[in-house]
Amino acid sequence: MAGPRPVVLSGPSGAGKSTLLKKLFQEHSSIFGFSVSHTTRNPRPGEEDGKDYYFVTREMMQRDIAAGDFIEHAEFSGNLYGTSKEAVRAVQAMNRICVLDVDLQGVRSIKKTDLCPIYIFVQPPSLDVLEQRLRLRNTETEESLAKRLAAARTDMESSKEPGLFDLVIINDDLDKAYATLKQALSEEIKKAQGTGHA
């Protein structure tokens, strides 16, 4: 595909992916485009349909997955999450670098497609730090917190697999982590800027 490559960002919940992405989008709002994921979970307070997620029924999502309309999907805590081909195409149609925020299962699914993105894993300095960050959010029950930490431990182990990620960023200092992320994407940012973006 011509133009800048998409970016796949992965990492455990609480590693700081959303914060890093927010900074990236603030600095380069005309260059990056978020691929909006689908989910069958209920919206959290303040979340908007079509902006944070496409909130859909399980029946609708299962039908579209069966039809091959998703490049990746996964189930977590009883809810389906996934990225549709259409969501990625919508970003590419605007000539932007498409950002996909997916879990490890999603990364493996995307590896089987012809998307050819840059794969980046964001991880916390330790599981203890991750637990503190998740507790500060105050959105988890003890049970869901334990599940997230177990998943994070597995993800952090898997991120060491050779060839799975192009870059692993340890987010112990937000500014440093952001500088590393920007450096990794500098070539693609230049490409996107060269296509008439400010």
Swiss-Prot record:
Give the location in the cell.
Photoreceptor inner segment; Cytoplasm, Cytosol
Q: What GO biological process terms does the UniProt entry carry, in alphabetical order?
A: dGDP biosynthetic process; purine nucleotide metabolic process; xenobiotic metabolic process
Tissue specificity comment: Widely expressed. In retina is expressed in inner segment, outer nuclear layer, outer plexiform layer, inner plexiform layer, and ganglion cell layer (at protein level).
Enzyme Commission number, as recorded? 2.7.4.8
Annotated binding of substrate, by residue = 37-51
Q: Which GO terms describe its molecular function?
A: ATP binding; guanylate kinase activity
A single cellular component GO annotation: mitochondrion
Does the keyword Transferase belong to this entry? yes
Share what the entry says about its subunit structure, partners included: Monomer. Interacts with RD3.
Mind telling me what this protein is named? Answer: Guanylate kinase
Could you tell me which species this protein originates from?
Mus musculus
